[in-house]
Amino acid sequence: LQRSLNQELQRIDGYHRGNGGVSGGTIESAFSMRNYKSKYSMGHPFLLNSKEYIKTQNISENKDNFKIKYIDDIKLWSAPFVMAIANTRVVRRSSEIHDKNQASYGSEFKYQEYMMLKKYSSAFLVTAGLAVFGLMLISPISGLFRKLFTKAGNGPDKKTRENGWFESIFIGKNKNNEKYKLRMFCKGDPGYKSTAKLICESALCLALNSENLPNTNAGGVLTTSTGLGSTSVSYTHLTLPTRAQV
């Protein structure tokens, strides 16, 4: 997106929808987060960033957005996305590492993710459902609520994994308010088959193209973007059809 706009990015908003099963392991991780010990809570938008970087950022402008909104660029409604609390933190860590390697996304770069739905009523139900689930996670009797969901080690059957899918639309914007839209689609359960494809692509990237990977001296634990760079994009195009437009 940054190369397409040929300028620093001011922000990127990602919108997702799909169909698939529920992972018992993911549910278990969610309920275990209350035991996570850190100086910052899981709700901190820069949870994975350094103290020095956090001091330079506007925390309030990067907080998770739980509002329902009609998005004119895609003609759909947005709602909170359950994986945004993880994905956005990783992207912000990538942004910091790229800054240190003189490959900045943009000095005022912001990133958010949402679900996209056809109807306001659907967006409202998703928002309400996530709110209830969030209350279950922090409840004193969360252990009892945990029993209502899929057990760790269990997940969707083969038919569900094969018939699942996801679609993502990313809208990048620069300081001149020029926009660029990127659409991705993948067949296969988002949390299983589609994720397995991405893991395999990363493995191939490391095994076959190590000489083309970014030579980064900053970051410690790297993200996909900072560790694999544009080399991984060429592999992703093989399995995830993409379409872009200004």
Each language-model region and where it sits:
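Conserved small/polar residues in nucleotide/adenosyl-binding loops
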Residues: 235-242
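Short beta-strand elements
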Residues: 168-174, 184
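Active-site-lining helix/loop region of Rossmann-like oxidoreductase modules
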Residues: 2-152, 156-164, 168, 180
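Glycine-rich phosphate/pyrophosphate-binding loops
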Residues: 207-223
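Low-complexity, glycine/alanine/valine/leucine- and proline-rich hydrophobic stretches
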Residues: 185-202
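Short, highly charged C-terminal tails/helix-capping segments
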Residues: 218-234
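Short, hydrophobic alpha-helical segments
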Residues: 2, 98, 199-211
